Regions:
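Active-site acidic carboxylates
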Residues: 2-94, 154, 160-167, 172-175
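A short glycine-rich beta-strand->turn/loop micro-motif centered on a GG-aromatic cluster
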Residues: 118-122, 142-156, 176
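Short, conserved acidic/polar surface loops in the N-terminal third of protein domains
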Residues: 60-64, 105-107, 130
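A short helix->loop->beta-strand "cap" motif at the edges of active sites that frequently abuts
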Residues: 45-47, 139-143
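Cofactor-binding loop segments of dinucleotide-utilizing enzymes, especially the Rossmann-like FAD-
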Residues: 14, 54, 122-124, 149
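Conserved strand-to-helix beginnings and helix N-cap segments that scaffold or border functional pockets
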Residues: 106, 129-132, 156-160
Length: 176
């Protein structure tokens, strides 16, 4: 019992940015999870919440990602780059990243002696799965869960495939 009081559990909000919700790469599925994400954020204190923020610059279209996905999105300083206004509830830390996964986030979780991490956000099949697997690699004893009801993928099919991939890598998928 006393151990459970000392456990450190964090929530990580992945790339919950305007461009992925109703902007250049937005989807109706992303818009549909907004209320659930806001509800989930409210169950954690500010010092228990982390976030990632996809961050690109003017040279995006010259990058490998930009050549494979030639849609300008999440350019730093633009409205599309901002975390959705209802999700701006305060975070212990926000990790800006210009790649799918944040090594800095994974190192932070390892170095902070975290016991459990819950991930929510966008896109299940790109940045959520990338960050879940990075955390699993950097901190293999941390219990990782992903709330499927607070995530969405590029397509419903790729969302499902990513959830199955994470399950096979010993990541607990809840509300599936």
């Amino acid at each position: 019992m006393w151990y459970s009081l000392l456990m450190k559990k964090l929530l990580v909000l992945i790339d919950f940015q305007n461009d992925f919700i109703d902007g250049s790469l937005g989807t109706k599925e992303a818009q549909a999870i907004v209320p659930k994400v806001i509800e989930k954020l409210a169950t954690y204190a500010e010092n228990e919440r982390l976030a990632t923020q996809d961050t690109h610059f003017e040279d995006y279209l010259t990058t490998q990602e930009g050549q494979n996905l030639p849609v300008i999105h999440c350019q730093k300083g633009t409205p599309g780059w901002e975390i959705h206004k209802e999700a701006q509830v305060g975070f212990q830390r926000v990790f800006e990243k210009n790649i799918f996964g944040s090594v800095e986030l994974a190192e932070y979780i390892r170095n902070e002696n975290v016991d459990q991490v819950e991930l929510i956000g966008i896109c299940t099949d790109i940045c959520v799965v990338s960050n879940a697997l990075l955390i699993k690699s950097f901190a293999p004893e941390v219990k990782i869960s992903v709330d499927a009801s607070c995530c969405t993928g590029v397509t419903p099919e790729s969302h499902r495939a990513a959830l199955e991939t994470m399950k096979s890598c010993q990541i607990n998928v809840i509300n599936d």
